[in-house]
Amino acid sequence: MAENNNLKLASTMEGRVEQLAEQRQVIEAGGGERRVEKQHSQGKQTARERLNNLLDPHSFDEVGAFRKHRTTLFGMDKAVVPADGVVTGRGTILGRPVHAASQDFTVMGGSAGETQSTKVVETMEQALLTGTPFLFFYDSGGARIQEGIDSLSGYGKMFFANVKLSGVVPQIAIIAGPCAGGASYSPALTDFIIMTKKAHMFITGPQVIKSVTGEDVTADELGGAEAHMAISGNIHFVAEDDDAAELIAKKLLSFLPQNNTEEASFVNPNNDVSPNTELRDIVPIDGKKGYDVRDVIAKIVDWGDYLEVKAGYATNLVTAFARVNGRSVGIVANQPSVMSGCLDINASDKAAEFVNFCDSFNIPLVQLVDVPGFLPGVQQEYGGIIRHGAKMLYAYSEATVPKITVVLRKAYGGSYLAMCNRDLGADAVYAWPSAEIAVMGAEGAANVIFRKEIKAADDPDAMRAEKIEEYQNAFNTPYVAAARGQVDDVIDPADTRRKIASALEMYATKRQTRPAKKHGNFPC
């Protein structure tokens, strides 16, 4: 049925209800059967299917279904654009109220015009007003060229709204199709981006790049999910398809509060904090041997269940949401199996972003430390490791949520500070007996301090080994730091979960104020 702008109204209520049903059928059909079939043939759900699958059954309440564009140029006066290419409204996820929007690629390629952007922004404003999370499925060819500057203005309003919501309600972007040009800045301004393997996101596409720079690149290589996860770090989760993306969004939301005035999520506690002796066997005493820190995480969180964030990016650092005794926490952990757990530019950015989010939404932070230092190298220095490393220092210093730090093994120099030691505001600091808390490793320190003795010795190698052991025993232990109050307790690894749970309970009522200011100057 074609859209009818001059509908002759029926003379009875029953007739008008029938007309309403017909009008709604046109709107819900989107771009029509042929375009819906094409969407399905590409392994993609339609805009309404995505919302219905994401939200609790029968909970979606659409708003603005009858909204229309007001453009008359370039044949737009005759164009049928149901819901102006975006479905907006409210519903619930696992019983929790949310606001959501979903671009409809079957309607003019999901292109964003004035009315579409207005609908999205109004939905975001309602999320802000009610203190509810906002979720948005992006699937659009970009700006609606027929509307000219009005479409550009619409993007600007969306960006402004993204920033207004930032730190107040969680924003989750799901890239489920093309997201090109200026449109890609909106998801970049949200808290989390979930991207399906069939989606693409870039400022300029392969054809433009080819014409300007001569570079040959495919859409997947340039802006596919794997590229954005492993190389650019623009996204937080990769999903196989729409179904998987919706499941990730639900799990992610389960760890988050509704807004910044609520405490961290607390559900389904696992009260078992009995010693887990398996933790004693994961971390080798020999600092040159690697291990997977995720094995440690699995032993200290409820049910061994956690949601890793940016799992494929800066893999020398692990960031994840989990629960300890039912309480939602954010975990930041060095990964010794990759680059020995060194902090580099990408890991610093990854950690700082995660810490900022957790602090914004009252989620306690747990640090698992095994870090030998910042990654040395000319490219790291030229790339701005000083500035990027400072982001971690800034984020942890600014954070006022409970901060619990556990030193598993190495904790050397400035990299230890960047992982939130006592001086950067850690509320509780624990160390395993394997911890080496020092300004630098024993080998490097011995080479500096005892350089003359080693050089003058009859057997320099034997003297070096002796001095390394001497320094190791004197300084690279947890007990010197404990004696100076830098560590609260040296603990049996088996007791780690109990110690963290106890500290989280103690600091659940933590309140900390800082000097009044408009905002700090975050090192960008």
Swiss-Prot record:
Name of the top EC class for this enzyme: transferase
Coiled coil: none
Record-level GO cellular component terms: acetyl-CoA carboxylase complex
Transferase in keyword set: yes
EC code(s) of this entry: 2.1.3.1
Residue intervals of the CoA carboxyltransferase C-terminal domain: 274-506
Region named Carboxyltransferase: 13-506
Catalytic activity from the UniProt record: (S)-methylmalonyl-CoA + pyruvate = propanoyl-CoA + oxaloacetate
Keywords: Transferase
One of the record's GO molecular function terms: propionyl-CoA carboxylase activity
Record keyword tRNA processing present: no
Biological role: The 12S subunit specifically catalyzes the transfer of the carboxyl group of methylmalonyl CoA to the biotin of the 1.3S subunit forming propanoyl-CoA and carboxylated 1.3S-biotin.
Assembly mode: Homohexamer. Transcarboxylase is composed of three subunits: 1.3S, 5S, and 12S. The core of the enzyme is composed of six 12S subunits. On each side of the core there are three pairs of 5S subunits. Each 5S dimer is attached to the core by two 1.3S subunits. Thus the total number of chains is 30 (6 + 12 + 12).
Record protein name field: Methylmalonyl-CoA carboxyltransferase 12S subunit
Organism: Propionibacterium freudenreichii subsp. shermanii
